Swiss-Prot record:
Function: Probable methyltransferase.
Compartments where found: Mitochondrion inner membrane
SUPFAM superfamilies (UniProt xref): S-adenosyl-L-methionine-dependent methyltransferases
Family: Belongs to the methyltransferase superfamily. METL family.
Protein name in the entry: Uncharacterized methyltransferase C3B9.04, mitochondrial
Single GO term (MF): methyltransferase activity
Superkingdom of origin: Eukaryota
Length: 248
């Protein structure tokens, strides 16, 4: 390696070290500032989430697709959602993010529930291109709008607990809508396995919520335990912050 290349290489390593050090210093400063304010109560999502999702609807898919490919979440969606079959209910469906992951030959009906109007509009437009004509497609703004006495073979929810004010009540509703041999498939994010990471999530939870309508540090395991669901499996990824759950 020539002198010039060595100089560039060493300079690059030095610059990267300075950058990482600056980021670490900023994180530490923000965490300590947050903890010095003694905010012991974790943020709980509220109805403002809907207005936030309406505001970010147009950029939502573009933004999360890049992040999910990088973090591996894209592939978690692929391997979990291919198990959906029969009459499928997806709650918090957003702009139709999960359409590419469904095995349509296994699906008879697809019912979406999405409270954000802008997200519903995008999903309806995508459904015309993505959902096969032999699959009955419907969309509602609220679970209470579902046809009476309706039940489902598969209930899907991906990254929704973070924006649900009454998450346990919502999970319990799914059990009442599930057929006796049905499955509930969830991908969620929340509190991680490591204290240092959770301190960072806590410090930035409020600003992240204001931008994305998402409380990213909720205790997912505790919420599941408080619900009436029977958990068949719960696998965690990304330092424990991403949860892949199968339940009934």
């Amino acid at each position: 390696m020539g002198i010039l290349k060595k100089t560039i290489f060493i300079g690059g390593i030095y610059g990267l070290g300075v950058y990482i050090g600056a980021v670490a210093w900023r994180l530490r400063k923000d965490v300590l500032n947050y903890e010095s304010r003694q905010k012991s109560d974790l943020l709980i999502p509220n109805s403002n989430s809907i207005s936030i999702y309406n505001q970010i609807a147009d950029k939502y898919s573009r933004k999360i697709t890049r992040e999910e490919i990088f973090s591996g979440i894209y592939f978690l969606r692929y391997f979990l959602l291919r198990n959906a079959k029969g009459d499928v209910l997806e709650v918090g469906s957003g702009p139709g993010t999960n359409f590419p992951f469904y095995k349509w030959k296994k699906i008879n009906t697809l019912t979406l529930v999405e409270p954000a109007e802008k997200m519903r509009e995008i999903a309806d437009a995508r459904a015309k291109k993505k959902v096969p004509p032999n699959v009955l497609y419907r969309q509602f703004a609220d679970l209470r709008q579902l046809p009476p006495n309706q039940s489902y073979d598969t209930i899907i929810q991906t990254f929704c607990i973070c924006s649900q004010e009454k998450a346990v009540e919502q999970l319990n509703n799914y059990r009442s809508l599930l057929r006796s041999d049905g499955r509930i498939l969830l991908i969620e994010h929340g509190k991680g396995k490591y204290k240092f990471l959770n301190r960072i999530l806590n410090a930035y939870a409020e600003s992240h919520y204001e931008s994305w309508g998402c409380v990213w540090n909720r205790d997912i395991e505790q919420l599941l335990e408080d619900s009436e669901l029977t958990i068949d499996s719960c696998k965690r990824f990304n330092f424990g912050t991403t949860y892949v759950i199968e339940a009934h």
